[in-house]
Curated annotation (Swiss-Prot):
Pfam families: Ribosomal_L36 (PF00444). This is Large ribosomal subunit protein bL36. The gene is rpmJ. Keywords: Ribonucleoprotein, Ribosomal protein. The lineage of its organism: Bacteria, Bacillati, Bacillota, Bacilli, Lactobacillales. It comes from the Bacteria. GO terms for molecular function: structural constituent of ribosome.
């Protein structure tokens, strides 16, 4: 899980979602692409 000031999809499988007011990226294809804003 990377924590970044700005999160962007890194591949076509990445999905941008909101959980508990936080913007996150989840990726089923490549778990290294998981990110969270903050």
């Amino acid at each position: 899980m990377k924590v970044r000031p700005s999160v962007k999809p890194m591949c076509e499988h990445c999905k941008v979602i909101r959980r508990k007011g936080r913007v996150m990226v989840i990726c089923p294809a490549n778990p290294k692409h998981k990110q969270r804003q903050g």
